[in-house]
UniProtKB/Swiss-Prot annotation:
Name of the featured protein: Allatostatins
Record's signal peptide: 1-27
Biological function: Neuropeptides.
Native organism taxonomy: Eukaryota, Metazoa, Ecdysozoa, Arthropoda, Hexapoda
Main location: secreted
Residue span(s) of the pro-peptide: 28-56, 80-86, 188-197
Residues found modified as Leucine amide: L96, L106, L154, L184
Segments of this protein annotated with the region Disordered: 161-197
Amino acid sequence: MRSRTSVLTSSLAFLYFFGIVGRSALAMEETPASSMNLQHYNNMLNPMVFDDTMPEKRAYTYVSEYKRLPVYNFGIGKRWIDTNDNKRGRDYSFGLGKRRQYSFGLGKRNDNADYPLRLNLDYLPVDNPAFHSQENTDDFLEEKRGRQPYSFGLGKRAVHYSGGQPLGSKRPNDMLSQRYHFGLGKRMSEDEEESSQ
């Protein structure tokens, strides 16, 4: 029994001793040594105060409960970035792989003989929006349509005459005979070639 009471007394003394040391350590931590520590502890106690030392904007901020949150400029097939500060950007500048008007089709071939600087650029960059205005696009499309009407289809091949000249360099009557020449790999027969010359 004596050993039991001595173990109990020594454990109580041990706990009492560490209780006093622990309280003094807490008391030392609670009293700040300088004003810098006081500011640090206040920031720790108030989690809503943030360090605004960095000048960059936050990506997501709450403005008000009735105002809209910031709009992000992304999308599926987004091809350009508007650098102007306009809220909406250009009209209809979104979509799945948005491209030029009427620049689609099965087996569509883009010959850039007249426009060598375009280099098959199907997407409209934003670096010069005046160049890509509706008037310029309409002029380009009218010129493109006026040259070879109905020149599309699966397996469409450019027609060259026996003289080696392209289709557009002949007289207008010769072009009218070839106007509706399209289809699945359609070619002229020898009889048709002789009658057209």
